[in-house]
């Protein structure tokens, strides 16, 4: 029996759902014998992206789905995150000024900066009223 190279999960826009995503990434990493550092990096990247969507993406209190797909091919993990929140292109967010003392830095943007620094490639598009963020990360142990 072969191990799935693609796995998806539908999350609700609640912070507690991030635990389900973390578990999925860990199981996927184990199944494909990915390096622990790579699995941790992917979990941090997804944590930053998904928490940002949950915290800032919606104008109403309704439940929304956030779809996350992982696909491994030739040692490269493709990650797709899709949501129906407000249009938001994380590539348009300027990086934080890390030279300023932390108490003088404006609030926001650090999580996106972290995610962008972890991903080897990041692309955004708006499609049929949905944000679609696609990222690629080279796996050292794949």
Q: What is each model feature region?
A:
Residues 64-71:
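A conserved short beta-strand within the histidine kinase catalytic ATPase domain
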Residues 79-107:
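Glycine-rich/acidic phosphate-handling loop/turn and adjacent ATP-lid/helix
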């Amino acid at each position: 029996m072969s191990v799935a190279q693609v796995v998806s999960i539908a999350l609700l826009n609640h912070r507690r759902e991030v635990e389900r995503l973390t578990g999925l990434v860990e199981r996927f990493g184990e199944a494909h014998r990915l390096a622990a550092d790579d699995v941790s990096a992917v979990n941090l990247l997804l944590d930053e992206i998904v928490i940002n969507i949950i915290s800032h993406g919606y104008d109403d209190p309704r439940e929304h789905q956030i779809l996350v797909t992982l696909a491994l091919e030739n040692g490269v993990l493709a990650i797709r995150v899709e949501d129906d929140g407000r249009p938001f292109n994380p590539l348009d967010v300027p990086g934080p000024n890390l030279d300023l003392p932390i108490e003088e830095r404006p609030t926001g943007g650090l999580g996106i900066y972290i995610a962008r620094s972890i991903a080897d490639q990041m692309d955004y598009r708006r499609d049929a009223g949905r944000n679609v963020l696609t990222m690629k990360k080279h796996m050292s142990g794949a």
